Amino acid sequence: TKKVFQSGFVWRVVRQKWPDFEEVFFGFDIDKILLMPDEMLEQKASNPAIIRNFNKVKTIRENALMIDDVRRQHGSFATFVASWPKDDVVGLWEFLKKNGARLGGNTGPYALRMLGIDTFLLSRDVEAYFVEHGLITGSVRSKRSLKTIQDTFLTWQQESGLSFQELSQIVSFSCGDNYVGMAN
C-alpha cells in the first residue's frame, strides 16, 4: 500500500502520514480490511489524516483480497513470493500487475524490494541503457524486451555475484542523468 500511494505523490508526504494510515487501516490486518463494507472504505478515504485519494484507498482492500487468495492457495503470501523462481522476477511482476491493484510499472518491483525480494528496477536510466546499447528495440515493457532485460540481469548476476538491486543501481549510474564518470 505504501508503494501504491508513493506512486505519483511526494514520498516524504506518504512517509509522514504513514503512521496514520496504519492506525486508520487496522495495522493492515488483512482479515479486518476484508471485512470493511464499502461505506466504511469511503469514510476512511475522507479521513484528513491520510491521503484522500479514493481510487488508491480502494486498492487497500483489493490488494488485501489478492493476498488472501494467495494465502488460501499457498499457505501464506510470504511463502508464495519467497518460493517464486529467482530467475523469473519479471513473472512475479506480471503476477502482481495482473492480480493486484495498481501494482504495474515499477510499483510492484518497489513493493517487492520493500518485502526483501531482490529485484531490479526499470528506471528511465536502466531503460536508456538497454536501448542505447541495442539490447532491446521497441517497447521496453514488451514481453520480448522484458525477457531480454531479465536474461541480461541474470547473466550479470551469475558473472558478478551481485544482487539485482546492486546491478540495477550500477546500470543507473552508468548512463542518463545519473551518470557517474571516472575522473581523468
Spans of features found by a protein language model:
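Alpha-helical ds-nucleic-acid-binding substructure associated with the helix-hairpin-helix region
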Residues: 26-102
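Short, aromatic/basic-rich helix-turn unit that serves as a nucleic-acid recognition element
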Residues: 1-13
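C-terminal accessory module of base-excision DNA glycosylases/AP lyases that mediates lesion recognition
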Residues: 82-184
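Short, solvent-exposed positions on alpha-helices
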Residues: 12-13, 58, 165
